[in-house]
Each structure stands twice: as structure tokens, then as C-alpha cells.
Amino acid sequence: MALLCYNRGCGQRFDPEANADDACTYHPGVPVFHDALKGWSCCKRRTTDFSDFLSIVGCTKGRHNSEKPPEPVKPEVKTTEKKELSELKPKFQEHIIQAPKPVEAIKRPSPDEPMTNLELKISASLKQALDKLKLSSGNEEDKKEEDSDEIKIGTSCKNGGCSKTYQGLQSLEEVCVYHSGVPIFHEGMKYWSCCRRKTSDFNTFLAQEGCTRGKHVWTKKDAGKKVVPCRHDWHQTGGEVTISVYAKNSLPELSQVEANSTLLNVHIVFEGEKEFHQNVKLWGVIDVKRSYVTMTATKIEITMRKAEPMQWASLELPTTKKQEKQKDIAD
């Protein structure tokens, strides 16, 4: 019976009776994600593309390992003994002071309001970077056309979650089992957006079998534009909320950010063939006419003017339990 190898970067099935000392090619280190770059601590190679990261060939040879790594130990939460209500009451005389009535908040507009494209401000650094890329791509265009149809032996499939490599013409007839969604890392959990099997262990995440069947994608030309995750964060001042998306060399003519008072839809094309999508149901209300987007060579900043000067508890409006159930049913 074939067993699954849990060595990092392998994920292959093997026969335990034919497990030689050099049968497995794997990474002894750990995955490193820093400033949008992804790689392994044991290797020097870094990439911004998650599929390229998954296809980085291991740097060490050894025996296959069928032992599943233990789940990270969760901290034990200790609770104190319950105290009587009388013990929790303050020992001094209470004086209740009635606070003044708060200023009436702005009524939340309907999310069905028409969407408006936010103004795009393009920095000089981005213009210079795009001009350089156009010159270099023009010089290499002929060479790319010659090499585009050639698939080298050992080329990894570009579909997410597929660890197969090209071994010849027979590989063109194989069925590819892959993940059609994008990888999501949130609050220590790792999963694919298409099947939502969550795990806290990165090795287990890499070994998750795909949920979709189709054909292998051996070249980026066949893959077309690929939806990829981007590192992003947000901050706020008294009157503005700013979202920063760390995508290099974004293309203004193909990118779009649209919004209404409570919704934000982000679509960014960057580095020629990568796409980033994000739909945000905003916690507060914004003034669309006074909001704009600044595009630089290294990131995109979405500046939204608050409709009222108040502190937002978070960027996104929390979903209700009813909405979560409806979303799970839809998935």
C-alpha cells in the first residue's frame, strides 16, 4: 500500500519496501514569507508567486517519511473559580452618572447603491518602472515566442495543489487533480478558498488533495492571468481609512477600484500576468467623491474619506451567523 510522504516539499506517495536513502527530495527547513517574497529557510531562492513557491524543488535527499507531524500545541486557558455576585460588587458606594445622549449616527446606506470607479493617481516611480519593463519585454519578445511551445522534462504543473511534473507526451493525457481557488492564510489557519479544509500545519496544507479535476497547465502562457494572494494591511486617522496592497508594477490601464458608500471592490493586475481581487464590506460609511487610489512601483494605496469622523472598530463589517450559514450553503 502506497503511503503519503510528509517531508516538506515532497507530498508524493511511496512504497515503504522500496524506500531508498535518496528516494525523497525535500526541504529540511521551514517556509518563509517576508515582504511578499516566499521561499524556504534552507534555500536562497525567493519568489512572489505562490505556485512557483510550491514548485521549488527540494534541496536535500533522504528517505520518505510517513509520519504525520504533530499539530501545534494550543495554549491551555485556565479559568478562575466562579465568585458570588456579592463578592464582585464594589465595596464603596456607587454613584450612577447619566451620560449625555450621543450624536445621532449617520444611517447606513443600502449596499445596492451604484458603484463608482475611484480616481487613479499614478506616481512617477510607477511610470518609470513600466517604461523600463516595456523596453526589456520588447527586446526579449522574439526569444519568448520561440521558447513558449517547448515543455522541458521536469516542469511542474502550474495548477494550485498539483505536484506532478512533465515526464513526456504521456503527461499531456493525465488527469490533473488541483485546487481551483487561491491559498488563504488567516489567523494561523491555512486553507484553499475552493474547499475550505482548514489546518494549522503548513505541511498538511501542502499535502491536501485537490478538489477539482481537469488538464495540467505546463506553461504560464496556457495559464493566462493567475489570481494570486497579496499582502495587504490598513490603517486609519480621524477622517480617513487607507488600505495598502503590496503589488509591484501594477498596470493602471487594466486595474480598477470601485466603491459605493459601504462596499469596496478591488481588481489589480500586476507584474504582467497576475491578478489580485478583494471585495470588502466596509465597517463604516465613506464619501466616495473624496476617495482615491495612489499607484506606486511597489504598492497601491486606497484612501477612503470617512463620511463622519469616528474610529472604525475594524475594516470589514462582521458577518452575522445567518450570513455565514448562507455562505456555507452556497459554497
UniProtKB/Swiss-Prot annotation:
Positions bound to Zn(2+) 3: 157, 162, 176, 216
Residue span of region Disordered: 62-82
Pfam families in the record: CHORD, CS
Binding site for Zn(2+) 2: 27, 42-43, 59
Any GO BP: centrosome duplication
Domain CS: 227-316
Top-rank lineage group of the source organism: Eukaryota
Transmembrane segments annotated in the record for this chain: none
Entry GO MF terms: ADP binding; ATP binding; Hsp90 protein binding; zinc ion binding
List of residues that carry Phosphoserine: 51
Phosphothreonine modification, residue list: 47
Region (Interaction with PPP5C): 2-77
Stored Gene3D superfamilies: 2.60.40.790, 4.10.1130.20
Entry protein name: Cysteine and histidine-rich domain-containing protein 1
Gene name of the record: Chordc1
